[in-house]
Amino acid sequence: LPLLDKDTGQATERAQAVIDVFPEQYQVEYRQGMARKLGLAGFEDGDEVLASDLLALMAQERTDFTLAFRRLADLAQPGTGQQIGELFEFSDAFTPWLQRWNQRTSGDPQSASERQAMMYRASPAFIPRNHLVEAAINSAEADGDYAPFNQLVDLLGQPHDFRQDLARFAYPPRPDQVVTQTFCGT
Protein backbone atom coordinates (compact mmCIF):
# COMPACT_ATOMS: atom_id res chain seq x y z
CA LEU A 1 0.00 0.00 0.00
CA PRO A 2 2.78 2.52 0.66
CA LEU A 3 3.64 2.37 -3.04
CA LEU A 4 0.17 3.64 -3.93
CA ASP A 5 0.03 6.56 -1.53
CA LYS A 6 1.76 7.77 1.61
CA ASP A 7 -1.63 8.16 3.27
CA THR A 8 -2.86 4.69 4.28
CA GLY A 9 -6.51 5.64 3.82
CA GLN A 10 -5.90 6.96 0.31
CA ALA A 11 -3.78 3.92 -0.57
CA THR A 12 -6.51 1.59 0.64
CA GLU A 13 -9.14 3.43 -1.42
CA ARG A 14 -6.99 3.28 -4.54
CA ALA A 15 -6.29 -0.42 -4.06
CA GLN A 16 -9.96 -1.14 -3.42
CA ALA A 17 -10.96 0.73 -6.59
CA VAL A 18 -8.73 -1.58 -8.64
CA ILE A 19 -10.00 -4.67 -6.84
CA ASP A 20 -13.61 -3.61 -7.38
CA VAL A 21 -13.29 -3.51 -11.18
CA PHE A 22 -11.15 -6.64 -11.47
CA PRO A 23 -13.98 -9.23 -11.71
CA GLU A 24 -15.63 -7.38 -14.59
CA GLN A 25 -12.33 -6.83 -16.39
CA TYR A 26 -11.40 -10.47 -15.88
CA GLN A 27 -14.70 -11.61 -17.40
CA VAL A 28 -14.19 -9.40 -20.46
CA GLU A 29 -10.66 -10.74 -20.99
CA TYR A 30 -11.72 -14.33 -20.31
CA ARG A 31 -14.56 -14.14 -22.82
CA GLN A 32 -12.32 -12.58 -25.47
CA GLY A 33 -9.59 -15.15 -24.90
CA MET A 34 -12.02 -18.05 -24.92
CA ALA A 35 -13.69 -16.72 -28.07
CA ARG A 36 -10.30 -16.77 -29.80
CA LYS A 37 -9.58 -20.30 -28.57
CA LEU A 38 -12.96 -21.45 -29.88
CA GLY A 39 -12.58 -19.57 -33.16
CA LEU A 40 -15.46 -17.20 -32.54
CA ALA A 41 -15.53 -13.60 -33.74
CA GLY A 42 -17.12 -12.71 -30.40
CA PHE A 43 -19.14 -14.18 -27.56
CA GLU A 44 -22.88 -14.48 -28.15
CA ASP A 45 -25.69 -15.85 -26.01
CA GLY A 46 -24.93 -19.47 -25.25
CA ASP A 47 -21.21 -19.23 -25.91
CA GLU A 48 -20.37 -19.14 -22.22
CA VAL A 49 -22.17 -22.49 -21.86
CA LEU A 50 -20.38 -23.86 -24.93
CA ALA A 51 -17.02 -22.88 -23.40
CA SER A 52 -17.78 -24.14 -19.90
CA ASP A 53 -19.15 -27.42 -21.27
CA LEU A 54 -15.90 -27.93 -23.18
CA LEU A 55 -13.77 -27.23 -20.12
CA ALA A 56 -15.89 -29.57 -18.00
CA LEU A 57 -15.66 -32.30 -20.63
CA MET A 58 -11.91 -31.84 -20.92
CA ALA A 59 -11.57 -32.19 -17.15
CA GLN A 60 -13.89 -35.20 -17.05
CA GLU A 61 -11.97 -36.94 -19.84
CA ARG A 62 -8.62 -35.95 -18.33
CA THR A 63 -7.73 -34.27 -21.59
CA ASP A 64 -4.53 -32.33 -22.11
CA PHE A 65 -5.89 -28.80 -22.54
CA THR A 66 -3.01 -27.58 -24.71
CA LEU A 67 -3.31 -30.43 -27.21
CA ALA A 68 -7.11 -30.27 -27.17
CA PHE A 69 -7.24 -26.60 -28.12
CA ARG A 70 -4.64 -27.16 -30.85
CA ARG A 71 -6.61 -30.09 -32.23
CA LEU A 72 -9.76 -28.00 -32.17
CA ALA A 73 -7.92 -25.41 -34.28
CA ASP A 74 -7.00 -28.18 -36.74
CA LEU A 75 -10.69 -29.06 -37.02
CA ALA A 76 -11.59 -25.47 -37.91
CA GLN A 77 -10.33 -26.25 -41.41
CA PRO A 78 -9.64 -30.00 -41.68
CA GLY A 79 -6.76 -31.11 -43.86
CA THR A 80 -4.93 -27.81 -43.59
CA GLY A 81 -2.87 -26.04 -41.01
CA GLN A 82 -0.43 -27.70 -38.69
CA GLN A 83 -2.41 -30.86 -37.88
CA ILE A 84 -1.52 -32.50 -34.58
CA GLY A 85 -4.02 -35.30 -35.09
CA GLU A 86 -1.40 -37.99 -34.66
CA LEU A 87 -0.55 -36.53 -31.25
CA PHE A 88 -4.11 -36.15 -30.00
CA GLU A 89 -7.65 -37.01 -31.02
CA PHE A 90 -10.85 -36.22 -29.17
CA SER A 91 -12.57 -39.21 -27.60
CA ASP A 92 -16.11 -40.13 -28.63
CA ALA A 93 -17.36 -38.28 -25.55
CA PHE A 94 -16.58 -35.03 -27.39
CA THR A 95 -18.74 -35.79 -30.44
CA PRO A 96 -21.91 -34.00 -29.23
CA TRP A 97 -19.89 -30.98 -28.13
CA LEU A 98 -17.99 -30.86 -31.44
CA GLN A 99 -21.31 -30.92 -33.29
CA ARG A 100 -22.51 -27.94 -31.24
CA TRP A 101 -19.23 -26.13 -31.92
CA ASN A 102 -19.46 -26.80 -35.67
CA GLN A 103 -23.01 -25.48 -35.69
CA ARG A 104 -21.97 -22.35 -33.77
CA THR A 105 -18.93 -21.59 -35.93
CA SER A 106 -20.85 -22.14 -39.17
CA GLY A 107 -22.82 -18.97 -38.43
CA ASP A 108 -19.76 -16.87 -37.65
CA PRO A 109 -18.74 -14.22 -40.21
CA GLN A 110 -15.10 -15.23 -40.59
CA SER A 111 -13.77 -17.79 -43.05
CA ALA A 112 -12.49 -21.17 -41.91
CA SER A 113 -8.89 -20.14 -42.63
CA GLU A 114 -9.29 -16.91 -40.63
CA ARG A 115 -10.87 -18.88 -37.79
CA GLN A 116 -8.08 -21.43 -37.79
CA ALA A 117 -5.34 -18.78 -37.85
CA MET A 118 -6.95 -16.99 -34.90
CA MET A 119 -7.23 -20.26 -32.98
CA TYR A 120 -3.59 -21.15 -33.62
CA ARG A 121 -2.52 -17.72 -32.35
CA ALA A 122 -4.60 -18.25 -29.19
CA SER A 123 -3.40 -21.78 -28.46
CA PRO A 124 0.30 -22.59 -28.40
CA ALA A 125 1.50 -25.95 -29.68
CA PHE A 126 4.35 -25.96 -27.20
CA ILE A 127 4.34 -24.91 -23.57
CA PRO A 128 7.05 -25.17 -20.90
CA ARG A 129 5.86 -28.49 -19.52
CA ASN A 130 7.30 -29.24 -16.08
CA HIS A 131 8.88 -32.54 -17.09
CA LEU A 132 10.74 -30.88 -19.97
CA VAL A 133 11.87 -27.95 -17.85
CA GLU A 134 13.07 -30.30 -15.11
CA ALA A 135 14.98 -32.46 -17.60
CA ALA A 136 16.66 -29.36 -19.05
CA ILE A 137 17.58 -28.05 -15.60
CA ASN A 138 18.88 -31.44 -14.49
CA SER A 139 20.99 -31.76 -17.62
CA ALA A 140 22.50 -28.33 -17.08
CA GLU A 141 22.98 -28.79 -13.36
CA ALA A 142 24.25 -32.37 -13.29
CA ASP A 143 26.15 -32.58 -16.57
CA GLY A 144 26.84 -28.98 -17.51
CA ASP A 145 24.94 -29.72 -20.74
CA TYR A 146 22.86 -26.70 -21.71
CA ALA A 147 21.74 -28.11 -25.08
CA PRO A 148 18.33 -29.32 -23.79
CA PHE A 149 17.76 -25.96 -22.10
CA ASN A 150 18.74 -24.02 -25.22
CA GLN A 151 16.54 -26.22 -27.40
CA LEU A 152 13.59 -25.63 -25.09
CA VAL A 153 14.19 -21.87 -25.05
CA ASP A 154 14.40 -21.80 -28.86
CA LEU A 155 11.22 -23.84 -29.18
CA LEU A 156 9.31 -21.65 -26.73
CA GLY A 157 10.41 -18.57 -28.65
CA GLN A 158 7.85 -19.59 -31.29
CA PRO A 159 5.35 -21.68 -29.32
CA HIS A 160 2.52 -21.36 -31.83
CA ASP A 161 4.44 -22.87 -34.76
CA PHE A 162 3.93 -26.62 -34.63
CA ARG A 163 6.80 -28.60 -36.09
CA GLN A 164 6.41 -32.33 -36.56
CA ASP A 165 10.13 -32.93 -35.94
CA LEU A 166 9.70 -31.43 -32.46
CA ALA A 167 6.40 -33.16 -31.65
CA ARG A 168 7.95 -34.90 -28.64
CA PHE A 169 7.92 -31.50 -26.88
CA ALA A 170 4.15 -31.23 -27.29
CA TYR A 171 3.28 -34.38 -25.35
CA PRO A 172 2.23 -34.27 -21.72
CA PRO A 173 4.39 -36.31 -19.35
CA ARG A 174 4.15 -40.06 -19.11
CA PRO A 175 3.28 -41.27 -15.60
CA ASP A 176 6.98 -41.81 -14.84
CA GLN A 177 7.78 -38.23 -15.95
CA VAL A 178 5.24 -36.40 -13.81
CA VAL A 179 6.93 -33.71 -11.74
CA THR A 180 5.49 -33.65 -8.25
CA GLN A 181 7.67 -30.81 -6.96
CA THR A 182 9.37 -28.19 -9.09
CA PHE A 183 12.69 -26.49 -8.41
CA CYS A 184 10.83 -23.47 -7.05
CA GLY A 185 8.96 -25.69 -4.61
CA THR A 186 5.49 -25.65 -6.14
Segments the model singles out, each with a brief description of its role:
Residues 2-186:
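Regulatory N- and C-terminal appendages and interdomain linkers associated
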